[in-house]
Structures are given as C-alpha cells and as structure tokens.
From Swiss-Prot:
GO terms for biological process: translation. Part of the 50S ribosomal subunit; part of the 5S rRNA/L5/L18/L25 subcomplex. Contacts the 5S and 23S rRNAs. It comes from Mycoplasma mycoides subsp. mycoides SC (strain CCUG 32753 / NCTC 10114 / PG1). GO terms for molecular function: 5S rRNA binding; structural constituent of ribosome. SUPFAM superfamilies: Translational machinery components. It comes from the Bacteria. This is Large ribosomal subunit protein uL18. Keywords: Ribonucleoprotein, Ribosomal protein, RNA-binding, rRNA-binding. One of its GO terms (cellular component) is cytosolic large ribosomal subunit. The keyword Transmembrane does not apply.
Length: 116
C-alpha cells in the first residue's frame, strides 16, 4: 500500500508525539503549515494548555506561507515566549521534514532566544 505525502506525515507525527512531551518547565513548541498560513504554539502537555501562540493570520503576512513568513512567526513567538518567562522548549516539527520553512523557523527561533 502506497502512502500519500499527507499520510506519511501523519505517521511520522504519531511516532514523534509518542516521544515528545511538553512539561511546565520545558513546554512543547508545535508548528503547523497549511497552503496559505503558518502557525506556531507553545503547549504545556501536562495541563493541556496553550501558553503562547503566533501565526500569519494575526500579522501583516496574512495568507503567506513562505520562509519569510515562517521567520516572522518565529520572531513573534520567541518574543512572546520570553515575555512569558519561557526560554527552553521541546521542538515538535509535527511530522514535517526539517527542511525549508521548518528549518527557517527553527533557526530564527533559536537566534531570538529560544533554546531547543
């Protein structure tokens, strides 16, 4: 049985989520990309609460999902996380390959003060 790209991503995401858990001390930084937008949120899995979120929906980059938009979202989420006293996170790439937009997001978040 041949898998589509979406099915393969879902299987990778399921495998990764079994291992990656966000705690209060080190919450999970989750990313999601659609065809039109890029989203990121920092989640405390023990409480099941989103602590900080950012996306291209709330920025001047509405309906952009390129590497520039991913970098802007990374800057925004890093700024919000540092304001909320969050410096260390666990990166959950949501089954996406560490390439392109995801890589640009991760590197920019690291440059802006998040540690993972």
């Amino acid at each position: 049985m041949k898998f589509t790209k979406a099915e393969a991503r879902k299987r990778r995401h399921f495998r990764v989520r079994q291992k990656v858990v966000g705690t209060a001390e080190r919450p999970r930084l989750n990313v999601f990309k659609s065809n039109t937008n890029f989203y990121a949120q920092i989640i405390d899995d023990t409480k099941g609460v989103t602590l900080v979120s950012a996306s291209t929906l709330k920025m001047d980059l509405k309906s952009k999902s390129n590497t520039l938009a991913a970098q802007k979202v990374a800057e925004e989420i890093a700024k919000k996380a540092l304001a909320a006293n969050i410096t260390q996170v666990v990166f959950d790439r949501n089954g996406y390959l560490y390439h392109g937009k995801i890589k640009a997001f991760a590197e920019t978040a690291r440059e802006n003060g998040l540690k993972f």
